[in-house]
């Protein structure tokens, strides 16, 4: 596609999102409309490129399948409305097999670094700024041949001085959820045979009041500003000829400004790459028993006591009788020790037993609960970005690999209670200043209900863009009372029929936040959500979260509609609390770090009540977050509790429409992991229930408990 025009240079993040292939954009100054197209750039490569490719392939298969299922159902339309066809849901050449079933073949795609994007002017649809006459060029070559002739026309009735037209590229196009766009021009000639029209705009500013008027002298004919999508028209007319009933509104395109966000939605996803491929093995459908066992270990399910005789027999059976002799000797010595020393020795004995279990010398004595077994089996159909089991395993790996407080002057993981000199606030080299800082930090963390706060200097994260949609970012859109399928389009091929996937491999600063489990449980109880079985000693909240989880669905459809009737559960409420806290954190730190809200990303681990907020970008990390902490530290966290941060500029209007809007805690689509759903300020401060909630009683805010 590069031969169609020059290339544009922007940041890698911009090229992979705002300027990704298929987008219509204008340069600075607002003149002209251009279509971005893919070019062959540097192939993505890293020391873990094989693992990254594997994770992208796994995610894409699920994304394609979920999109297909949601689009073919169209929120129940498939059962009662006009039929839906696979070609309306997924681009055939990229995501469908010969049976028109969802398919993702990694060999048809190429992973690229977004270093350049091509572009050319399109659509070449011009309007006279004086009389409103329209003129359309078919392509760049047609424009090159004929634009001088058009510019020299002298038939403008509203330019009496020279009768010349004042041509400018029209900034409105027709768009359709099939992924197509067309110039704003009548679909057919006038009934008198004339092919030229005036665009008549209304004073109301509404597109619905615009229309086309025949330019021929004396012809009174006008046309509504409508156009049928060529792709959908060809598909449905063929079905109509065979007797299938369809409605004209399925084909009608929408007039949209090319500057409007609804014209183009780039489709992206993200993940934390794990060089250790054991995560893929453990999550494989054939490893369900091993996966269940790992969950029992992570969330501290209580083990049945094992007798000394059982330990002795097990160790002797694997030729480790000597290990038991040492164990028995230590246990006998414990009797004569003082309580403190005996406690330390008992911990050593417990560690020995756990080590033998990990080596396979001693079988674990935990019976897998039926609820865990059922969830491990059911998770194959869960949306991966909300799957608490997958995210729990990821969090466990993160704990082992990245959340370890390392040594050295430049620690990669920083405990902000004891930060190194380059992150520590000024003066904390003095003991009394450091103690005052720690006291203030401990106090505000308690008021926020935060148990753990770390800073990661280099969070390894991969974000990639793989296609786009128009009109809606999700698989369905409601237009004129009918739910329509939105077609997921891939980017056009760059070579040998390979389509680009743009990969952004980032290593930027981030904050890791984990909420206080006891406070969250208390908050759930205050909102009439008690955990059905009390947690045994040491058992973690994540155990009950996983056992009670019901799939949110890949697009959170149940939580979008104003007419939804969803019961509150410990899962959707805990997720909403965690998600809202992450947004509150981003909104606050964006003011102090010098980074805009769209420069951040979020990653949630709901079963572990933890989230990561990271700087999203491919430019060198200038240490904005560490500098922010050094300069403002506790003040940033205090702002999260301030009245201003817990209110909205929209006032009660926002409060009574779910407690989340762009004026308060909603974030750009590229930042939010859940499309700004399951989000409400009410979970932080007392407020009205979310629109999706069956229970319409007010929500008790988390901060009303943590600050009490």
Predicted regions and their residues:
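Conserved structured core elements
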Residues: 122-125, 166-170, 208, 507, ...
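Short cysteine-rich clusters marking metal-coordination/redox-active sites
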Residues: 128-131, 151-159, 175-176, 189-192, ...
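Subunit-assembly interface segments of extracellular/virion macromolecular structures
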Residues: 173-175, 183-184, 191-192, 577-595, ...
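Charged, low-complexity interaction segments
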Residues: 1-62, 193-576, 588, 606-608, ...
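N-terminal alpha-helical interaction blocks
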Residues: 1-167, 172, 350, 382, ...
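Elongated scaffolding segments in large macromolecular assemblies
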Residues: 190, 194, 617, 626-708
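Short cysteine/histidine-rich zinc-coordinating motifs and their immediately flanking basic loops
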Residues: 140-149, 174, 187-191, 203-204, ...
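Cys/His-rich microdomains that often coordinate metals
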Residues: 134-137, 160-168, 180-182, 194-196, ...
């Amino acid at each position: 596609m590069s031969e169609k025009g020059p290339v544009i240079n922007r940041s890698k993040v911009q090229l992979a999102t705002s300027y990704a292939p298929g987008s219509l954009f204008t340069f600075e100054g607002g003149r002209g409309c251009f279509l971005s197209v893919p070019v062959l750039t540097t192939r993505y490569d890293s020391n873990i490129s094989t693992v990254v490719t594997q994770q992208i392939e796994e995610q894409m298969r699920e994304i394609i399948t979920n999109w297909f299922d949601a689009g073919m159902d169209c929120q129940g339309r498939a059962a009662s409305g006009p039929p839906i066809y696979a070609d309306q849901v997924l681009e055939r050449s990229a995501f469908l097999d010969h049976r028109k079933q969802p398919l993702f073949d990694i060999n048809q795609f190429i992973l690229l670094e977004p270093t350049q994007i091509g572009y050319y002017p399109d659509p070449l649809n011009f309007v006279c700024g004086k009389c409103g006459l329209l003129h359309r060029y078919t392509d760049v070559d047609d424009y090159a041949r004929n634009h001088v002739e058009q510019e020299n026309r002298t038939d403008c009735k509203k330019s009496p001085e020279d009768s010349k037209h004042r041509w400018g590229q029209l900034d409105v196009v027709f768009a359709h959820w099939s992924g197509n766009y067309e110039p704003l021009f009548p679909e057919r000639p006038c009934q008198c045979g004339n092919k030229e029209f005036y665009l008549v705009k209304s004073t109301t500013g509404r597109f619905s009041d615009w229309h086309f008027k025949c330019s021929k002298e004396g012809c009174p004919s006008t046309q509504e500003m409508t156009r049928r999508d060529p792709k959908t028209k060809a598909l449905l007319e063929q079905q109509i000829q065979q007797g299938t009933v369809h409605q004209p509104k399925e084909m009608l395109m929408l007039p949209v400004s090319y500057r409007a966000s609804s014209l183009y939605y780039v489709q992206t996803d993200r993940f934390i790459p794990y060089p250790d491929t054991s995560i893929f093995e453990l999550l494989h459908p054939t490893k369900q028993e091993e996966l269940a066992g790992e969950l029992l270990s992570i969330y501290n399910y209580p083990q049945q006591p094992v007798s000394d005789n059982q330990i002795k027999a097990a160790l002797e059976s694997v030729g480790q009788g000597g290990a038991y002799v040492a164990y028995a000797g230590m246990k006998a010595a414990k009797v004569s020790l003082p309580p403190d020393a005996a406690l330390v020795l008992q911990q050593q004995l417990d560690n020995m037993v756990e080590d033998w279990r990990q080596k396979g010398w001693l079988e674990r004595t935990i019976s897998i609960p039926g609820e865990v077994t059922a969830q491990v089996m059911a998770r194959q159909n869960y949306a991966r970005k909300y799957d608490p089991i997958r995210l729990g395993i990821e969090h466990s790996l993160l704990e082992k690999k990245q959340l370890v407080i390392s040594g050295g002057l430049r620690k990669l993981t920083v405990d902000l209670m004891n930060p190194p000199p380059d992150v520590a606030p000024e003066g904390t080299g003095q003991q009394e200043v450091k103690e005052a800082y720690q006291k203030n930090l401990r106090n505000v963390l308690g008021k926020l209900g935060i148990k753990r706060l770390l800073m990661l200097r280099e969070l390894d994260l991969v974000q990639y863009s793989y296609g786009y949609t128009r009109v809606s970012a999700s698989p369905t859109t409601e237009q004129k009372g009918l739910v329509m399928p939105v077609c997921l389009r891939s980017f056009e091929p760059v070579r040998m029929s390979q389509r680009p996937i743009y990969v952004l491999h980032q290593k930027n600063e981030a904050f890791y936040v984990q909420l206080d489990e006891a406070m969250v449980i208390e908050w759930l109880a205050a909102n009439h959500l008690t955990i059905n079985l009390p947690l045994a000693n040491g058992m973690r909240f994540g155990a009950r979260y996983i056992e009670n989880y019901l799939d949110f669905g890949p697009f959170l459809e149940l939580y979008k509609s104003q007419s939804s009737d969803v019961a509150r559960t410990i899962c959707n409420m805990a997720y909403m609390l965690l998600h809202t806290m992450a947004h509150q954190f981003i909104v606050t730190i964006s003011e102090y770090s010098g980074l805009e809200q769209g420069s951040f990303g979020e990653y949630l681990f709901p079963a572990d009540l933890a989230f990561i907020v990271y700087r999203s970008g491919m430019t060198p990390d200038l240490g904005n977050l560490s500098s922010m902490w050094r300069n403002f530290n506790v003040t940033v966290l205090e702002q999260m509790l301030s009245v201003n941060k817990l209110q909205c500029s929209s006032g009660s209007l926002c409060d009574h429409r779910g407690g989340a809007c762009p004026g308060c805690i909603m974030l750009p689509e590229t930042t939010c992991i859940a499309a700004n759903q399951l989000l409400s300020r009410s979970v932080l401060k007392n407020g009205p229930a979310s629109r999706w909630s069956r229970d319409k009683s007010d929500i008790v805010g988390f901060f009303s408990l943590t600050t009490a």
